[in-house]
């Protein structure tokens, strides 16, 4: 689940995205201040638009909204008050974590891409990376699937030149860190970081 709020740009509407849906598949139902968006073919709920959001919630963010247990409980209460008989169950595990690059191999179909195996604590992800400085043995910042980058980009499972990739190894610039270097390259962490630790920025 991802949530977005931009009062000046969109109006007083909280946008909640659960999964992608094409325009051709798009269906919706209005329940009071809530519009439920669903896939017409599968009938799966793909998101909600909550109008007059500030009358229900205090949202300080402008753009992606940080998810928490309290926020999810509040959204479920809003759905319930507006007659939507659904309860959101959300993975609140950190989406930006420390990763350890266990291996790096040349991409079979692209000279400037590398295929990396990255340990992120509870699992090892295969991530295709285009940074020239990525290497085995580094500790890096990984945006896992479901992460929302400062730019608004949502990280999804992808296939890059025929090779599956689950997540992104981040640069300081992509993380919008102050004093990020101009040259292209991932952020390599120094110090006592452990794979799987949440990365705070």
UniProtKB/Swiss-Prot annotation:
Alphabetic keyword roster = RNA-binding, tRNA-binding
Q: Does the keyword RNA-binding apply?
A: yes
Which CDD domains does this UniProt record tie to the protein? tRNA_bind_bactPheRS
Superkingdom of the organism of origin: Bacteria
Give one GO molecular function term. Answer: tRNA binding
Q: Which Gene3D superfamilies match?
A: Nucleic acid-binding proteins, YtpR-like
Leader sequence segment = none
| Domain tRNA-binding: from-to ranges | 90-200
Q: What is the protein named?
A: Putative tRNA-binding protein YtpR
Species of origin reads Bacillus subtilis (strain 168)
